[in-house]
């Protein structure tokens, strides 16, 4: 994010649901695998758990805070514990993560450009409070023109999609499975 007088260097971790555009942001004074995992642990996973929807896959850039050897990289370990598949953007191709990049531009225009003109921040916590206030508005009151939003808020889109996903899941569960079990060989085919 940049250097803020009185606070120092600030880094932003961002999560954007690519279907609904629901976004979550947390600010940090460093950029590490631990802080990347903290956003998921503190905000993202609890949100999805509350909605009773599993987070199956995540797309990140190729930054060192997200990528490393799975057996000793904090972010990779966290994804493994949570059973989340990890996809990475193409190298030197920010457009691969265009939804997140577009969100950053919106946040810069609608949040940071305004709040930094109104107030001088002396702590990361104060800044996070104002960022969270803007995020609530973005997610819950600001209509979005995204592919699946059709002028609804990201949260309305998420809740609508939750119902659709539930219906699809029910139909796949109620179909007769095509499984035969051979007791002699103990194999599933």
Regions of interest found by a model, annotated:
Residues 1-12, 18-132, 136:
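RNase H-like DDE/DDD metal-dependent nuclease/strand-transfer catalytic core used by mobile genetic elements
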């Amino acid at each position: 994010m940049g250097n803020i007088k009185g606070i120092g260097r600030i880094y932003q971790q961002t999560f954007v649901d690519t279907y609904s555009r629901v976004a979550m942001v947390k600010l940090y004074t460093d950029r590490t695998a631990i802080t990347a995992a903290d956003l998921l642990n503190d905000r993202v996973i609890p949100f999805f758990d509350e909605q009773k929807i599993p987070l199956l896959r995540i797309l990140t850039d190729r930054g060192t805070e997200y990528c490393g050897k799975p057996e000793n990289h904090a972010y990779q370990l966290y994804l493994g514990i949570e059973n989340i598949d990890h996809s990475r953007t193409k190298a030197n191709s920010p457009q691969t993560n265009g939804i997140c990049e577009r969100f950053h531009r919106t946040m810069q225009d609608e949040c940071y450009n305004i709040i930094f003109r109104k107030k001088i921040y002396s702590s990361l916590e104060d800044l996070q409070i104002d960022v969270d206030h803007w995020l609530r508005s973005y997610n819950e009151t600001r209509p979005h023109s995204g592919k699946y939003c059709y002028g609804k808020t990201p949260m309305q889109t998420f809740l609508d999609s939750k119902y659709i996903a539930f219906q699809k899941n029910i139909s796949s569960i109620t179909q007769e499975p095509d499984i035969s079990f051979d007791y002699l060989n103990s194999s599933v085919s």
